[in-house]
């Protein structure tokens, strides 16, 4: 299935798990605890947590599909903050150095920023239709996002948009990340390309060894290595010093949807169909089955302490503890 197909097929409502006890699991109101996992269930049955990002203050932000709100978890309490318009496939989310959450709002043709106190500032796109994918915050205070409707990687800084069109006509971008030097990395799923945009705006493209791999999310490690998902090929890819390395995921047709890098260098990813989180460390992939039988892990982020956060399309926000994440 194509990247777009996976996103659209699974961004639909599924049932909320009823209150029950499973083994050593503990259910406390909307809190579920089991073997290093903690899951916070959504209070509204229709809420579908989608993208997730962690701020410098430890706040965990997440978008909610088919809702007019953004969610944030602080001190084990979820707040549902109204934003004024309903989300549809809210795939873009990033938290800047000041702790403000930036998010894409395709139906309203906006890029918006929500400050820690909930104040919203929005910046209108000039296109009649806006189809938007992933987003990343840059060290210089800019935010970048993949603008599928204009086939561009777009920068927003001080209220001004700058578009960098991809060289292959009609090919929509998806993943986006910014490295420490300010260079932007992105993915072109249908073209099977990894893209680099230099600080001067020069664009270079690189093709991984596996054909038709369908590159998805992308992230840059502290050592400068670029990591990305190969959704169709069911692999995790690495690009460093001009060379590609690919790591097959043990679970077949896992449904790779999101990627994040921990401070210790471990690469974390979600397996939507496999109902697992995956960790790639020192060339070895370890999988962590989620505690709920109907789990659909979609977004992923790692906080400064090493806790791994993920969204569950079945209606939850989850955390894998640092101790469990760094173990075995």
Where are the predicted features?
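Blade-level signature of beta-propeller repeat domains, shared across WD40, Kelch, NHL, RCC1
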Residues: 296-328
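Residue-level detector of Asp-centered blade-edge/turn motifs that repeat once per structural unit
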Residues: 54-57, 95-98, 137-140, 178-181, ...
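N-terminal Sec-pathway targeting helices
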Residues: 2-21
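Beta-strand-rich domains and repeat architectures in extracellular enzymes and scaffolds
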Residues: 41-68
